[in-house]
Amino acid sequence: MGRYFGTSGIREVVNEKLTPELALKVGLALGTYLQEGKVVIGCDTRTSSVMLKNAVISGLLATGIDVIDIGLAPTPLTGFAIRLYNAEAGVTITASHNPPQYNGIKVWDRDGMAYTPDKEHELEKIIESGNFRRVPWNEVGTLKTANPRKEYIEAILREINLKGSYTVVIDAGNGAGSIVSPYLHRELGNRVITLNSDPSGFFVRELEPNKESLSMLEKTVKVLNADIGIAHDGDADRVGVVDENGEFVEYEVMLSLIAGYMLKKYGKGKIVTTVDAGFALDDYIRELGGEVVRTRVGDVAVAEELVKHGGVFGGEPSGTWIMPQWNLTPDGIFASALVLEMIDRLGPIGELAKDVPKYVTLRKKIPCSNELKNKVMNKIADLIPREFSYERIITIDGIRIENDDWWILFRPSGTEPIMRITLEAHTEEMAERLMKKAENLVKSVIKDLSS
């Protein structure tokens, strides 16, 4: 990670590390890097988003870059608008699933793919140098506003076709998805009920769509006898799913199901995922004649591998999916329509999920300052051979150790001051035992290095 950019752009607490001054510099740096052309910019519903968006716009205009402001917009809408308006780049002001005190700045290229670490490093060098391009008064960029929502929905309707009509409950999490996702599903012919659909920066539930945060969605699906529940995070680059029985479908299961459906829809090929994805995906995809390729965590890494291998689908076990036939931007809204198409063609998710191999997955977050992360990882690397007996090790992002019946991933978060432990095992007893051992190791290392 660089000084400013992590695994998902810049993401920090507002008015502490992420200030309007920094946002202005990002705009100046991006304009200096591009030299010419148009940039699309949109933001999520956070209370600080308009403030930061306007600062980035000012920096871009000062360098002679024309800006198209699409206002409140889910991240996938920004990715779509880049191509719609033939822009050189796009910017989203969002902290995705982080708590409301956070915000972020994420930059996208003309193909809708997030800026790579190399490109972000170039922006950081320009910020550090302070050598910004500043044009004279008669060359300042122009600012236009636009609303591409209609075109976005129409484009999805050309890709997704439902034969039936379904009852869909959508929990938009008070995020930017609330202004698009319910409308799309009504246009698809579904009966739509919404939860947390007020686009407010004071979020009612935890933004990360998971079983703990979606209890109300589960209850609503069950009470209304709905066909499916759909949930988004703050910028709708993710999708979470509740099945027809009112049960949250674990991300590992949904990743396997949708990857398998993409193979059936578009033909055999490579499925790209990240180092924190489990064995179930490999087992499920192998049966369908596909191949799984792993890369580091983050949608940009997934997108890069999709382009490199000509992959059919890319996804993370966090509900972040990229459909390259559609766009290289992670798109939780298009993904939700794709899930409905899968149900329409293959049957209820609860039934489909029975075909996905079941393993026990555990995740743990342990507080760790950003300054300590590298030292902690180095120490863990030294201690792992003494603490665990394993057959394989993968170090493309963090440290993943594997045996045939379990794996553990130690990885510093690129967006929060935490260490992440993710593991999978064939039995619950084994998973609990491994997690206790892994957690004790990380906590003891952090304690030793903090004293």
Swiss-Prot record:
Catalyzes what? Answer: alpha-D-glucosamine 1-phosphate = D-glucosamine 6-phosphate
**Catalytic site:** 96 (phosphoserine intermediate)
Give the enzyme's main class according to its UniProt record, as a single word: isomerase
Q: How is it modified after translation?
A: Activated by phosphorylation.
EC number(s) per UniProt?
5.4.2.10
Q: Which GO terms describe its biological process?
A: carbohydrate metabolic process
| Cofactor(s), names only, from the UniProt record | Mg(2+)
What sections of the sequence does the record tag as coiled-coil? none
Keywords, A to Z?
A: Isomerase, Magnesium, Metal-binding, Phosphoprotein
What is the disulfide pattern of this chain?
Answer: none
Comment on bound cofactor: Binds 1 Mg(2+) ion per subunit.
The UniProt GO MF terms for this protein read: magnesium ion binding; phosphoglucosamine mutase activity
Sites bearing Phosphoserine, chain numbering: 96
Q: Which residues bind Mg(2+)?
A: 96, 233, 235, 237
| Record-stated family | Belongs to the phosphohexose mutase family.
Q: What does this protein do?
A: Catalyzes the conversion of glucosamine-6-phosphate to glucosamine-1-phosphate.
Query: HAMAP family in the record, alphabetically?
Result: GlmM_A
The molecule here is called Probable phosphoglucosamine mutase
Q: Which organism is it from?
A: Pyrococcus horikoshii (strain ATCC 700860 / DSM 12428 / JCM 9974 / NBRC 100139 / OT-3)
